[in-house]
Design a protein with these regions (language model features):
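Extended alpha-helical scaffold and adjacent linker segments that couple domains
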Residues: 1-293
Length: 293
């Protein structure tokens, strides 16, 4: 997901493609653009404010401007004012976001409440945006990636860069018998549990995909990392990595492979050391950055 400050026609063409685009439209000096009502575009726009917000915004802008040519001593004074005004602006936005911002998705416009979103008490702006995005973009994601796992038991309802590593580590510990709610949520989403919550790789389409690739190999041949993972580069720099089937994050593939090791379906060699069902405990203790590479 990309979060842009501005309109679609202000987005740099150099930016790599993403599955979703969230736009925070300019509240002032608005840029005209045509809403093409795309299923992967979501817009937030400040609909109205009040005198308090306007005053703090003007003071913030003035202090930021005056700081440029100020003496070192005055720069510190203006920076304190900038920080103070920014804090007030942030508080106002947190307190009033639900009632003062409009959402537009596929031509429909309204407030968070108009879209029927359930928000937890004291939700931050980031949490509100995440909840709205999940609620409105989930159907499109399911159409685009129908075989991507559903993690319905995850606390926040979705995986993100900020929580993925923690969930994956818990899932790996579950394979060692240390069951946690977080770990089971990942294993369940990857179809690595039977009806009794026991680990199995037999029913998982993700595990069966890996197994099918292994079966195409001749005796003594190995399945290499780059046969499972697609790496996307932008101007020669690594941007994203996904599995070639299902578009799984490499971290989720680690869980699938670990479950297959546990079941005796495969062995993995990392840095000349081979891991199988007898030393799975050593495998899951490796840094996730090494396991997912």
């Amino acid at each position: 997901i990309y979060l842009f400050l501005g309109a679609p026609n202000e987005r740099s063409t150099a930016q790599p493609e993403r599955d979703f685009y969230i736009y925070m439209l300019r509240p002032y000096l608005k840029t005209p653009f045509k809403d093409e009502q795309k299923p992967d575009e979501l817009f937030f726009e400040l609909n109205h404010s009040d005198d308090r917000f306007e005053q703090f915004l003007k003071r913030y802008a003035a202090a930021d401007d005056l700081k440029i040519d100020a003496t070192p001593a005055m720069k510190n004074l203006y920076q304190r004012k900038i920080d103070s005004y920014f804090k007030e602006l942030t508080k106002w936005l947190n307190d009033n976001f639900v009632t003062t911002f409009n959402i537009t998705y596929r031509g429909k416009k309204g407030s968070v409440l108009d879209f029927g979103m359930f928000l937890p008490g004291n939700a931050t702006i980031q949490e509100i945006i995440n909840i709205v995005a999940e609620g409105l973009l989930t159907d499109w994601f399911a159409q685009k990636y129908p075989d991507y796992p559903i993690f319905g038991e995850i606390k926040d309802g979705y995986l993100s860069k900020s929580n993925l590593e923690a969930y994956v580590k818990e899932a790996l510990q579950c394979l060692m018998g240390k069951e946690t709610r977080m770990g089971l949520a990942i294993l369940n989403g990857l179809v690595l549990l039977d009806n009794s919550n026991k680990v199995t790789a037999k029913k998982s389409g993700y595990a069966n995909w890996v197994k099918a690739l292994l079966e195409t190999k001749g005796q003594g041949q190995v399945l290499n990392y780059n046969e499972l993972i697609e790496t996307i580069y932008i101007r020669g720099v690594e941007d994203l990595q996904y599995t070639k089937e299902f578009r799984l994050e490499p971290e989720l593939l680690v869980v699938v492979l670990a479950a297959m090791i546990s079941a005796g379906d495969l062995e993995i060699t990392i840095d000349a050391k081979t891991y199988n069902a007898t030393n799975l405990n050593e495998y899951v203790q490796l840094p996730l950055s090494k396991l997912s590479r």
